[in-house]
């Protein structure tokens, strides 16, 4: 078992067994995690049936992003004996995927099943809680989130927008991009129009790519019509479902921009405060278990998907070390520039950077390369 695999398994298991120990942050309680307003709850005696809507950024048929949300819905219903019902809605059924943040913040939607990376234009710092270019593997990522202050900062930021959120699914490394032609150098990327997500989009822009943030279900039409020249979205098994192979025959790895990705379950803070403590902890526990399940499924499902993708005439490529070095250099420039412009962003980056420096001592000693 190599280092990244072992770290992923350990991280997933750690998240799955943290029952009743943490309430949205390590070593504390929700009131500590929310720096604005007071997180409260009702007693079991006051408990009534709760019916909430959960618009999703991912269709129910999509592995992990969608199926993880449906599993969450079912687990909550069963474990609450039908007292807490959170109904999953496909993208567009209630809201367009990129409007979930505003709707939950305003109370127009109770909850959302999505990714904090979609809010890059609203709150740049939230991108750290979805995926980090050249960032940590799964074990290190959840260690920072649950024990290094990451989750506490996530809660503090969201609370200022009348939202409370937590990671609720996790995926292994993604593909780096689908292209119509073989990319032989970084220079050939310049001028391309490409769908790109999160902080990685800033890196691509730094090297001359024009990026757009497009929700998953809208990517294929944009690629097919030529609105974009290339795209990235997720792991092979999820990309396969979206049909990118029909248009682009060159698929690149590794996913330097998303070595591990977190998805979130977000709740309007007023609605959250109306829940009993039992229902709050039920949600916390189901999310932690869902993190383990989705990560394990994600790792297990990739090889069969890659075989099918190749059978459809797609060539798999791995970026040269020279290209990865250029991208990593661009990332270091981007993150320092963004930190200099946004105090909230700088605070989260400082926490992550410090944690990774300390973790590296343990990682280098404890794990095989």
Sequence positions of predicted segments:
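N-terminal secretory/targeting leader peptides
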Residues: 2-141, 153, 158-369
């Amino acid at each position: 078992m190599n280092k990244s695999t072992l770290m992923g398994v350990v991280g997933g298991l750690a998240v799955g067994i943290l029952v009743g120990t943490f309430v949205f942050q390590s070593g504390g309680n929700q009131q500590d995690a929310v720096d604005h307003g007071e997180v409260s709850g009702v007693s079991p005696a006051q408990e009534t049936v709760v019916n909430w809507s959960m618009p999703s950024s991912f269709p129910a048929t999509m592995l992990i992003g969608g199926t993880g949300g449906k599993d969450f819905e079912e687990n909550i219903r069963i474990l609450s004996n039908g007292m807490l019902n959170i109904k999953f809605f496909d993208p567009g059924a209630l809201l367009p995927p990129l409007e979930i943040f505003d709707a939950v913040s305003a109370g127009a939607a109770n909850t959302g099943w999505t990714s904090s990376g979609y809010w890059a234009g609203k709150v740049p710092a939230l991108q750290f809680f979805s995926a980090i270019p050249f960032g940590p593997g799964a074990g290190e990522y959840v260690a920072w989130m649950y024990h290094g202050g990451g989750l506490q900062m996530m809660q503090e930021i969201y609370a200022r927008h009348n939202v409370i959120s937590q990671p609720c699914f996790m995926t292994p490394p993604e593909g780096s991009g689908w292209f119509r032609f073989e990319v032989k150098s970084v220079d050939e990327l310049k001028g391309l129009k490409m769908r790109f997500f999160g902080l990685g989009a800033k890196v691509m822009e730094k090297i001359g790519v024009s990026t757009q943030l497009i929700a998953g279900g809208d990517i294929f039409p944009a690629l097919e019509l030529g609105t974009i020249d290339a795209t990235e979205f997720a792991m092979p098994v999820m990309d396969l479902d979206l049909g990118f192979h029909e248009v682009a025959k060159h698929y690149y790895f590794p996913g330097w921009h998303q070595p591990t990705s977190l998805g979130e379950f977000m709740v309007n803070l007023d609605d959250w405060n109306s829940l009993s403590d039992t229902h709050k902890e039920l949600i916390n526990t189901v999310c932690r278990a869902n993190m383990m399940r989705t990560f394990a499924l994600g790792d297990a499902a990739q090889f069969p998907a890659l075989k099918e993708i190749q059978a459809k005439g797609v060539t798999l490529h791995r970026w040269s070390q020279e290209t990865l070095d250029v991208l990593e250099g661009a990332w270091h420039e981007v993150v320092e520039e963004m930190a200099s412009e946004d105090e909230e962003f700088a605070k989260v980056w400082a926490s992550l950077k410090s944690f990774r420096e300390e973790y590296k001592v343990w990682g280098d000693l404890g794990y095989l390369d």
